Structures are given as structure tokens and as C-alpha cells.
Amino acid sequence: EMIKYGSNVVGGVTPGKGGSKHLNLPVFNTVKEAVKNTGATASILFVPPAFAADSAMEAADAGIRSCVAIVDGIPSHDMIRIKRYMRRYTKSEKMSLVGPNCAGIISPGKSMLGIMPGHIYKEGRVGIISRSGTLGYEAAQQLKNLNIGVSTSVGIGGDPINGSSFRDIIGKFEE
């Protein structure tokens, strides 16, 4: 769906499957290898909860700037471990992590990093931030019905410990 929406998907990472292709895109063994070969700056995690913390930290170490963790059920202690790990980076180096248990990020008419139904969004000037994917979709659809568009919609996730708070995302909207 991200490719259909126009997002610039450059490859994937699956340890042990480097050198293969999926959806006609290269697959790499590590995020570092993917970044080196593609210049990727964003990542999306579609991994089992037990591997999510290591995947997020690997993305940060590889220089990924924005990461979306779609996966739900990441143990709270793993999210705490990720947040502590991220303290090693300066503010300008720190990866932005959205999720877990989220729908992702969409800027209508531009790009999507997630699993949102792109057809319900109209391009515009209103920002949406939601813990619930479904409520975010409903807000976007109601705005569209009123002919009001969305600049960006961010689903920060419904798990107890998130990578980004409402305050963090409002700060990004203000930048």
C-alpha cells in the first residue's frame, strides 16, 4: 500500500535473506547495509514483538531518522530499553520513533509510512495526532466530508509506552 500511495520504498531487511528481492526491491541483511546502499532515512518495523527493540536500536545505529513501529505487544521493559538506548544520541542525531501499535504517518498527496487507508485523506492544512488508528481514520474521513484537508496524520500508538508523545509530535508539526 505504501508503494501504491507513492512512498519511495527502497528495500527491506531480513537477516539471512540479503541479496534476494521482494516486490522487486532489494533485501538486505542489516539496516546499516540498507542505508549504505540506498540512502534510506526512514524505516518501518513489521517484526514480532520479541525482535522489535533490537530492530529499533539497529535502525537508530544505522542512521535512520524516522522509524515507525507498527507491531503491537512490545513488552514494556523493551520500550524502556529503547528509550534509554536513545539517550546516547544528541537531539540532532536522535531517531524519531512512532509507535508501537500504531497505524503510522501519512502526509496526504505526498507519502505514507504505515498501514493507513490513504484514500480517506484529503490534502490540506489540519494535523491529526491520535493514539487510536481507527479514531484517526474517523477524524480524517469526517474532515474530508467537510471538504477540509489534512497536512499530516500521525498515529502514535496505543501501547502503554510509546516512542513519541503527543507533545513530541506537536513539536514536529511546529518545526
Predicted regions and their residues:
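Catalytic-core regions of core metabolic enzymes
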Residues: 1-175
